[in-house]
Amino acid sequence: MFDFSIVTQWVHSLLTSFMPEELAVLIECIVIGVCIMLAYAVIAIIMIFMERKVCAAFQCRLGPMRVGPQGTIQVFADVFKMLIKEIITIRHADKFLYNLAPYIVILASIMAFSCLPINKGMEVLDFNVGIFFLLAASSIGVVGILLAGWSSNNKYSLIGAMRSGAQMISYELSVGLSILTIVILTDTMQLSEIVERQADGWFLFKGHIPALIAFIIYLIAGNAEVNRGPFDLPEAESELTAGYHTEYSGMHFGLFYVAEFVNLFIIAAVATTIFLGGWMPLHIPGLDGFNAIMDYIPGFIWFFGKSFFVVWLLMWIKWTFPRLRIDQILTLEWKYLVPIGLCNLLLMVIIVVFKLHF
């Protein structure tokens, strides 16, 4: 498996050979920031196109086909259309909070996106408390959503924001419990270290029953946390028009839209990192030839392949199941997922203490 840190160390030594180290670090930070923004934009474009095609497939349609080959340039046309739209601020809105809210949501999404270990040595933010930072960064987005609903001075926006806040805060608990189950198994909160521990097998397969239960809980709770169907009640069109971003137009609406899709990718990428081995290839015990071939595939291809498979799975769920009511959503969380998650966590503790894991 290629270690990308060799490249970063070579670039750092090259820059420090003809400039002060402080200036070299500053240039590296700028380059990394630009790369993160470009990767964020590319992921958003792919996710939007994938959503439209997957939706069309489940509805027996073709989806975007007009602009570009097989509709591949349709997303760029939509972005251009959104860029030239006027940004309208409604009367009696709290203009400062109204304009600030989309940037808080997108900032939280970018911070969480920066934590993803795409390849060995290719982590931007790799702390020894990476899981803690990831959960903290992703939870900031609910502040922007609540501000968007409150500052819009619109009852539909406010109801959508309150629904979203209640839903996100509730399901954050189940997400944390499912991740904590694997943290107990690995005895580390560093994302890259969790991936390294899966070199001899993904936790979904070698973590016993608690890992499988935690994976299922994580998919359900993660889907609800990013307000995806069937948990998309905060923006239920039949009740609340567009929910908390009803009064937003132009690129302000575009920021909410992009953040929603990238947050879906982040949920899938974290599932890949924690349960599906991250950048680790698929190894089958006893098949050394097959395993050797799998090792030739670059780690980032494994990471993105697994992540987009989980994304497709979540999109499948969205376009298959009907929307739940708010009482059903909260009942599912507090009466079922949380108790099951706590019992599952206790079961994992017993397995680790008595060394019953593989």
Curated annotation (Swiss-Prot):
Its EC number is 7.1.1.-. PROSITE patterns: COMPLEX1_ND1_2. It is found in: Cell inner membrane. The chain crosses the membrane at residues 30-50, 96-116, 129-149, 165-185, 201-221, 264-284, 297-317, 336-356. GO terms for biological process: aerobic respiration. It is a multi-pass membrane protein. Pfam families: NADHdh (PF00146). One of its GO terms (cellular component) is plasma membrane. The keyword Transferase does not apply. It catalyses: a quinone + NADH + 5 H(+)(in) = a quinol + NAD(+) + 4 H(+)(out). Keywords: Cell inner membrane, Cell membrane, Membrane, NAD, Quinone, Translocase, Transmembrane, Transmembrane helix, Ubiquinone. GO terms for molecular function: NADH dehydrogenase activity; oxidoreductase activity, acting on NAD(P)H, quinone or similar compound as acceptor; quinone binding. InterPro entries: NADH_UbQ_OxRdtase_su1/FPO, NADH_UbQ_OxRdtase_su1_CS. NDH-1 is composed of 14 different subunits. Subunits NuoA, H, J, K, L, M, N constitute the membrane sector of the complex. NDH-1 shuttles electrons from NADH, via FMN and iron-sulfur (Fe-S) centers, to quinones in the respiratory chain. The immediate electron acceptor for the enzyme in this species is believed to be ubiquinone. Couples the redox reaction to proton translocation (for every two electrons transferred, four hydrogen ions are translocated across the cytoplasmic membrane), and thus conserves the redox energy in a proton gradient. This subunit may bind ubiquinone. Belongs to the complex I subunit 1 family. This is NADH-quinone oxidoreductase subunit H. It comes from Phocaeicola vulgatus (strain ATCC 8482 / DSM 1447 / JCM 5826 / CCUG 4940 / NBRC 14291 / NCTC 11154) (Bacteroides vulgatus). The lineage of its organism: Bacteria, Pseudomonadati, Bacteroidota, Bacteroidia, Bacteroidales. The gene is nuoH.
